[in-house]
Amino acid sequence: MSRAPLLIAAALVTAAAAPAAAQNWTSNWRTIAFKTVSGGTDVDRINVRGSYRYREVRLCVFNAPLAMRDFDVRFENNQRQDVRVRQRIRAGTCTRNIDLSGNRRDIEWIRLKYSPIRRGGTRPLVRVQAR
């Protein structure tokens, strides 16, 4: 008798978790680089390894909020794309999806420009995601 409610609860938990896992898989976002921002300056550079081509990019912030002004994307062919953000990104959230100009692009590095971070506070971790 006591096993039936346990089995039903396990089935419900499994069914509820399945759509979330499927959503993550179909979004195709890959974390291609990350960095904990220095906080001592208002500019940081994130190098991206490999030679993959992407259509879109977004930045996700963890551990603490970050007041992002903008970021520059530098491609392997030395072209650049300046992206204005001008928003406070809360911990656990991402910027809007940014279409990369031109055909599918190979990213070399991204330079972040943000408002200074208070000393002694938790420094944000920024993840670069692309697809």
Q: Where are each of the predicted segments found?
A:
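Bacterial N-terminal signal peptides that target proteins for export
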Residues: 1-8
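Bacterial N-terminal signal peptides
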Residues: 8-15
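Solvent-exposed serine/threonine-rich low-complexity stretches and specific carbohydrate-binding patches
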Residues: 31-35, 82-90
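Short, surface-exposed binding/anchoring microloops in extracellular/periplasmic proteins
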Residues: 36-68
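Exposed aromatic-hydrophobic patches
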Residues: 43-49, 94-101
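Noncatalytic modules at the cell exterior or secretory-pathway interfaces
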Residues: 52-59, 102-119
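Short, surface-exposed beta-strand/strand-loop-strand elements in extracellular ectodomains
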Residues: 62-85, 124-130
